[in-house]
């Protein structure tokens, strides 16, 4: 199975976890997914001051700047596998 196929499968598995991951885990998943699919975050697109959730998500993604698509995919897959081991799938 190719890396892209493994990444796509991991993204599908996230939706089938038995319980919701912690906020920190969700931010990590979001950041790795965005880095793998869109590349580096553009600081000019950072959400406004009052959008706390949007800022947290953007900042988590921005911290992954410079991480290659492949490395982000591998990290995402590893994170999902870790969550499956601790939370299980439905």
From Swiss-Prot:
Keywords: Lipid-binding, Transport
Keyword Coiled coil listed: no
Transport recorded as keyword: yes
Gene3D superfamilies assigned: 1.20.80.10
Domain ACB: 3-89
UniProt xrefs under Pfam families: ACBP (PF00887)
UniProt GO molecular function: fatty-acyl-CoA binding
A biological process term (GO) from this entry: fatty acid metabolic process
Residues where an acyl-CoA binds: 15, 30-34, 53, 57, 76
Family of the protein in this entry: Belongs to the ACBP family.
Free-text function comment from the UniProt entry: Binds medium- and long-chain acyl-CoA esters with very high affinity and may function as an intracellular carrier of acyl-CoA esters.
Name under which the protein is recorded: Acyl-CoA-binding protein homolog
Organism: Manduca sexta (Tobacco hawkmoth)
